[in-house]
């Protein structure tokens, strides 16, 4: 279920444009390297390239899902605030994975350096808060803004959720409630501030 939500997230976000656009570049280069044998291929490749990205989207999603599941285990310990912020970056794993696959090498590098902490929990966010991902995205942006104000509140809240996300694999509802609570508190803080 979260895969479709995740796909929807990617499609909602401008990242999908990057994904298609840059993959078009990538396949163009790929065809360029083949241009020795297929001279016409580079010229045609931008046209068929929209099809490969759709496949690539699926592959990427599967790849991302694996990443999520692996990193979920590692990143459950991450602070929920990071997870919330990462939910805003939900599409960015696609950038990250694209980079690890050798595409977009220039683009995600600054992103990775800017948000290395967020990039990693972000798969956690997509799995744990996928249902809340769409609302959380805005809330996460709010959380980012309110993060400084929430700093005082954040540590105690951080202490409990790392345990509850660990449960997220068994019962996704709990972390969602956690994150919804976090989201609401973030929103309230924003409005109160």
UniProtKB/Swiss-Prot annotation:
The keyword Cytoplasm does not apply. GO terms for cellular component: nucleus. Residues 18-31 have a biased composition (Basic residues). It is found in: Nucleus. The keyword DNA-binding applies. One of its GO terms (molecular function) is DNA binding. Residues 174-193 have a biased composition (Basic and acidic residues). Residues 18-57, 153-193 are annotated as: Disordered. Keywords: Developmental protein, DNA-binding, Gap protein, Metal-binding, Nucleus, Repeat, Zinc, Zinc-finger. Residues 34-44 have a biased composition (Low complexity). GO terms for biological process: segmentation. Gap class segmentation protein that controls development of head structures. Belongs to the hunchback C2H2-type zinc-finger protein family. This is Protein hunchback. It comes from Drosophila petalopeza (Fruit fly).
């Amino acid at each position: 279920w979260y895969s479709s939500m995740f796909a929807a997230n990617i499609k909602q976000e401008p990242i999908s444009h990057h994904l298609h656009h840059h993959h078009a570049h990538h396949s163009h280069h790929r065809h360029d390297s083949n241009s020795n044998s297929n001279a016409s291929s580079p010229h045609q490749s931008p046209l068929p390239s929209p099809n490969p990205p759709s496949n690539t989207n699926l592959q990427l999603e599967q790849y991302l899902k694996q990443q999520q599941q692996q990193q979920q285990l590692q990143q459950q310990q991450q602070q929920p605030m990071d997870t919330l912020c990462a939910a805003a970056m939900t599409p960015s794993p696609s950038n990250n994975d694209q980079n690890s696959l050798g595409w977009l090498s220039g683009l995600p590098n600054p992103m990775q350096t800017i948000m290395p902490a967020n990039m990693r929990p972000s798969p956690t966010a997509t799995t744990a808060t996928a249902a809340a991902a769409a609302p959380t995205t805005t809330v996460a942006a709010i959380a980012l803004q309110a993060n400084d104000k929430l700093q005082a509140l954040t540590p105690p809240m951080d202490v409990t959720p790392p345990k509850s996300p660990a449960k997220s694999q068994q019962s996704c509802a709990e972390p969602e409630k956690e994150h919804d609570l976090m989201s609401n508190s973030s929103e309230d803080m924003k409005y109160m501030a």
